[in-house]
Amino acid sequence: MIQLKLTFIYVLVAGVLSAQNFKAGAIGGISTSQVSGDQLGGFNKVGVKLGSFVNHPINSATRGELAMYYIDKGSNDLNSNFRIDLSYIETSWSIQKTSKGFIYEGGLLFSILVDGKTYDIYGYEDITKGDFNKIDIGAKLAAGIKLKPKLLMFWEITNSLPFTPFQDHPGGASYGLNKGKYNSILSFSLRYLYSK
């Protein structure tokens, strides 16, 4: 029995060590975001998305990808100085499928809050509304195209999952799946592969 386990571990480790198909690259782009639950509408908060990724082929048309990047999220009222500024370090675990010249991607996100502030309608920081949850868990869908052999362009939509708001409603009020405020992001990014 022990020999069987050791053989299994050896085969598994040998397979991983012989896998030289990993590809790494850089991500750079723009994020536009809104907050569900702040009584505002529109993706009016503009920010940056910067980081890196590594992917590995599963088969000829499918890849698994792990990415880590900095991203700005939050909300911005165009009629006043009210805004929510959130900065995250985010990891993305996704599966990519290539079909008819397009790359389709779906996956999960895990974000750690780096900095978060709320500003009132006059532009002053409102420290009474700075009680943000440190973790935001979400899901994403994306579509992309290959511009050049080492350059990809992606459009992505992400949203916090219903049970993980980044901020609770005042007084802890809850309405079904609506437990608080949630991030919704539309982003555009370029992904550059370091090697083909």
Regions found by a protein language model. Give the residues of each.
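Outer-membrane beta-barrel translocator domains and adjoining extracellular loop/strand segments
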Residues: 36-42, 76-82, 116-123, 165-172
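Short glycine/proline- and aromatic-enriched beta-strand/turn motifs that initiate or cap beta-hairpins
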Residues: 19-55, 191-196
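Residues that define the transmembrane beta-barrel architecture of outer-membrane proteins
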Residues: 42-48, 85-89, 98-100, 133-139, ...
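Outer-membrane beta-barrel strand-turn architecture
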Residues: 56-60, 95-101, 147-149, 194-196
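Transmembrane beta-strands of outer-membrane beta-barrel pores
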Residues: 30-34, 68-74, 97-99, 110-114, ...
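Predominantly the C-terminal beta-signal and adjacent terminal strand-loop region
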Residues: 76-77, 139-141, 146-196
